[in-house]
Amino acid sequence: GSEIMSDCIFCQIGEGQIPSNKVYEDDKILCFHDLDPQAPVHVLIIPKKHITSLDDVTEEDSELLGYIMTKVKEIAATLGLENGYRLVNNCGEDGLQTVKHLHFHLLGKRKMTWPPG
């Protein structure tokens, strides 16, 4: 089964205890609109299993992470991001990770800049 943490907001969203504006959901992952969008399209993709950050990923999580990566293009297509998009992970304090549950930001519908912040 998927391990969840009762005090984690993303676990609560993944379990449906807190409502979200869902884009995609299956038994492994959830994608929902960010509450503070930084682009015309800004969604978060999370595993339902609680993994704190990329630093906490183990060998047994590799299939799940690969699965998330295969779903990105489907989610992007659903959102009309045919001109491209950016996938971001913030890890740790310096990476500005604010929620301690692994998540990927998918941003699109505007020209991105480089380097990122």
Where would I find each of the regions flagged by the language model?
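HIT superfamily nucleotide-processing domains
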Residues: 1-117
